[in-house]
């Protein structure tokens, strides 16, 4: 299964489980839930090399450092 299909199915299941009361600001909720483990996994993959992790993630090292602090990684 590709990542796009996984996300689509997961969001559909989440909305189904919520029934008639879907959460406000679903986009922000999903981004918060996904971004922290994404960054942690890429940092682990790079052995903690923030420059390489930032390159893989397509962000600046400064942005990566801010996110690491935000999520206490």
Each language-model region and where it sits:
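Bacterial C-terminal helix-turn-helix
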Residues: 1-2, 9-73
